[in-house]
């Protein structure tokens, strides 16, 4: 009974304080939502951003997915596309995806293709996820480079309706260079709603 009252409060604070990327190879599943939210509190982190990532299962293996990213440099961008989970086992899930990214304040369009997204299950509670994303110009002729992310995920709560994970990892961008080396540290809280 107390969990029913705490879940909405937990989800509210998760949305407020989550930060980081959350690409993985497991489909949301038909009729389910995967949501990850980032918040760069008061633009504290110079290279940080606030964004929301979503995935919705059209079928057991096909998702519509996307994100909206707010940057304090006033060049927000957004992405929409489809992902397809082509492999599933007890230990690993693999997906591919295609999508389009646009910027609000410039005419640049990028195609994210091909993409390889993966989930490795180390146990019932712990896994590794991430992605390799080839970012191309809009006519697909020129690759701008391959963005990478990898994270450790820990399941912190699950019931019939919700699943909540904490994720800690890194992101290797191609259009900017992190001040701390090649990888930018990330964290997020992912929520699955069935």
State where each predicted segment sits.
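N-terminal secretory signal peptides that target proteins for export/translocation
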Residues: 1-2
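A generic structural signal for short, non-catalytic loop/turn and secondary-structure boundary residues
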Residues: 11, 28-30, 87
């Amino acid at each position: 009974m107390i969990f029913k009252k705490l879940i909405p409060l937990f989800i509210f604070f998760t949305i407020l304080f989550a930060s980081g990327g959350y690409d993985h190879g497991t489909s949301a599943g038909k009729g389910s939502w995967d949501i990850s939210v980032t918040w760069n509190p008061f633009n504290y982190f110079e290279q940080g951003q606030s964004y929301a990532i979503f995935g919705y299962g059209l079928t057991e293996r096909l998702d519509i997915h996307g994100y909206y990213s707010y940057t304090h440099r006033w060049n927000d961008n957004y992405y929409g596309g489809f992902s397809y989970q082509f492999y599933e086992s007890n230990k690993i899930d693999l997906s591919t995806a295609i999508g389009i990214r646009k910027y609000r304040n410039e005419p640049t369009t990028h195609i994210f293709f091909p993409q390889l997204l993966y989930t490795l299950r180390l146990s019932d509670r712990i896994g590794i996820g991430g992605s390799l994303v080839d970012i191309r110009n809009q006519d697909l002729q020129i690759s701008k480079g391959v963005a990478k992310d990898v994270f450790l995920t820990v399941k912190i709560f699950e019931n019939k309706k919700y699943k909540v994970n904490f994720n800690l990892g890194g992101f290797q961008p191609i259009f900017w260079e992190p001040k701390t080396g090649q990888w930018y540290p990330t964290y997020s809280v992912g929520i699955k709603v069935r």
